[in-house]
Amino acid sequence: MKATAKKTTMMTTKATTASLKERLTRYRQIKISVSGRKSGKTISIPVWFVLEGGKLYLLPVQGSDTQWYKNVLKNPSIRIDARGVGTTFRAVPVTDAKAVKSVIEKFREKYGAKDVKKYYSKFDAAVVVQLT
């Protein structure tokens, strides 16, 4: 790749990430896409999230039993899409109890403890995506 093409791609990626972060401040739900660990096919699913600073926190609804979480363990590439603006990042699985509890608290603050209890059944894993 020529230097000018590489520079343009980097600038486009930064612009897309900035646009994505702006949209993430306005929405309560996003779409993530991961590669199936067996099929290799792209799988997309709507999820709740918490944006804090340059980090996006995800909480699998069935903890470590959640299929998209298992896929991330096999291939950490994850596409984050907020209503038409999206890009691909690296997902970092979190299993440390204290760190997972911190993510759960962030979700309770954003969505309410009642809804987190209603929709989430296992609390042993989370995912962090560095957006910056």
Regions found by a protein language model. Give the residues of each.
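A generic structural micro-feature
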Residues: L24, S39-K41, V72, S121
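Residues at structural and domain junctions
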Residues: A18, T25-R26, L58, F89, ...
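Short, structured beta-strand-loop surface elements
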Residues: G63-T132
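Covalent nucleotidyltransferase core used to form phosphodiester bonds in nucleic acids
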Residues: L20-E22, Y57-K70
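Short, conserved active-site entrance elements at the starts or edges of catalytic domains
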Residues: K2-K38
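Charged, low-complexity, helix/coiled-coil-prone segments
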Residues: T8-S19, T42-G53, F89
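Short beta-strand segments
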Residues: Y27-V61, I78
